[in-house]
Design a protein with these regions (language model features):
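Membrane-embedded alpha-helical bundles of multi-pass transporters/translocases
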Residues: 2-472
Length: 472
């Protein structure tokens, strides 16, 4: 059946929720690696930090490069499962299996064996995550041709992802890392990581299968099927995607917004700890508030995008985020007062949480609109390439931020061996977080200004596509 005709009816809520559920399992497993792998490998397995840093850095690069490759493979797959569901199903099981493998390293074996185990496990799980997530993301663009329903699909998907992040970073600390007679610090207990691995793999299986069965009636075939995958064709499709002005603006804008997110991830904890001298309870309150606002604001941003269109909604979100960064900089200047009244940081968390909420989901919806533009111009649909490239930019921005900020920490004389940093370092940490994020949001706002698609243009494109298909 014609893909455009197939997806013209409004989706059932059960389908949208079922699709979004897959992002919960993905978020659960990947956030476990982000939050706990370095500590597990260094503090529990006693591996050198330099080796683990090498593994993490190389895996991020591999993860980024493999995304567009997987997108190309998926775009050109011809299978009874469709071009996405074969990988969603196989990726679900392979992630669950390799995730358990990653967290089941014997402590008493040689260091080089532990390193090889961690190295191979990380690269395997990163590979299978790509096998799952790139076709999964592309499927989200194929479920509906409705301009506003696409925003709803991405909002629900984002809610699942952010919920997984909160559970892994906060709830798991209380549930799995309880002190025992043998391990007063629960996070040093090897069995705790095995238990989380069993739990996260089960979650991945349940949510991955939920997504598969909820969306299996939306199987699609390649609009133009390549009998043989070719490097020249792959490179050509990447070049075409980046030549497309509207996709290029999303790609670069999304890269900048995620650069701000990476800055928060790298130096956020440093700032909360050494600039504002907040304990784990206060940090948890602030970050928890930010995540919760981000989750509950998703439906609001869907309504805002419906009312003022997606581009205007994204720019509004960026402006609110810029205001949040300005607030943070003022709080850094008044850090001595904030040390006494950390509640000021909650106000910042609400503003930045609301502002960034739409930046998680709306650009993903906009990518689907640019693929319609591609089909009109070329007769091909390459959702896999487009979402793979978006993931590539996102992950490379993370890698760049980690690399640069590592040097920045040295430049501002951060000393990890002391609990109280000097005034210059305390101030500089807050400045890096607030000003660095602000500049990223400002650059993203400038880039998105050149995006041209809106609801009227996308609907006109879809009508022209339909006429071309009918005339064939």
């Amino acid at each position: 059946m014609d893909q455009m005709q197939l997806n013209s009816k409004p989706l059932k809520l059960s389908t949208i929720v079922g699709y979004g559920a897959g992002n919960f399992g993905y978020g659960f497993v990947t956030q476990m690696i982000t939050s706990y792998l370095v500590f597990y490998a260094t503090a529990v397995l006693l591996l050198p930090g330099s080796l683990i840093g090498l593994v993490v850095s190389l895996s991020i690069v591999w993860d980024a490069i493999s995304d567009p490759v997987m997108g190309y493979i998926s775009d050109n797959t011809h299978s009874k499962f469709g071009k996405r569901h074969l990988y969603i199903l196989s990726g679900t099981f392979l992630i669950a299996l390799t995730n358990i493998m990653l967290w089941h390293v014997k402590i008493d074996i040689a260091v080089w064996i532990k390193f090889i185990w961690i190295f191979s496990s990380v690269f395997l799980i990163k590979t299978f995550v790509t096998v799952f997530i790139t076709p999964y993301a592309a499927l989200g663009a194929e479920l509906s041709t409705d301009y506003n329903e696409r925003s709803k699909i991405q909002a629900v998907k984002t809610i699942f992802f952010l919920t997984a992040l909160i559970i892994v970073t906060a709830v798991c600390m209380f549930v799995f890392f309880r002190p025992t007679p043998e391990y007063e610090l629960g996070q040093l207990n090897p069995q705790a990581y095995k238990n989380i691995a069993y739990t996260s793999s089960l979650v991945m299986l349940l949510t991955g299968l939920w997504t598969y069965f909820s969306t299996k009636s939306y199987k699609t075939e390649a609009v133009v099927y390549q009998d043989k995958l070719a490097l020249s064709e792959f490179v050509g499709q990447i070049r075409y995607s980046l030549k497309c002005n509207d996709f290029r603006q999303i790609f670069i804008g999304y890269l900048f917004t995620n650069l701000a997110s990476a800055i928060i991830g790298v130096v956020g904890l440093h700032t909360f700890t050494y600039t504002f001298y907040m304990n784990n309870y206060k940090i948890g309150i602030v970050l928890g508030t930010q995540f919760l606002v981000c989750i509950f604001a998703q439906p609001i941003w869907v309504k805002i995008a419906r009312k003022i269109d997606k581009k205007a909604a994204v720019k509004l979100g960026l402006m609110i985020s810029i205001v949040g960064c300005m607030m943070l900089f003022v709080l850094v200047l008044l850090r001595r007062q904030v040390m006494v009244h950390y509640e000021y940081m909650i106000v910042y968390a609400i503003v930045i949480g609301f502002g960034t909420s739409g930046l998680f989901s709306l650009p993903l919806s906009m990518v689907a609109d640019t693929v319609d533009q591609q089909e009109l111009e070329t007769g091909e649909r390459s959702e896999g390439i487009y979402y793979g490239m978006l993931n590539f930019g996102y992950k490379m921005s993370q890698s760049i931020a980690i690399l640069i900020l590592g040097f920045v920490l040295d430049m501002i004389q951060f000393n990890p061996n002391i609990n109280i940093q000097n005034d210059f370092t305390s101030m500089a940490l807050g400045a890096v977080l607030s000003i660095g994020s602000l500049l990223s949001f400002v650059l993203a706002n400038k880039v998105y200004s050149s995006y041209n698609l809106n609801e009227e243009k996308v609907e006109a494109i879809q009508r022209q596509i339909q006429l071309k298909r009918v005339s064939k």
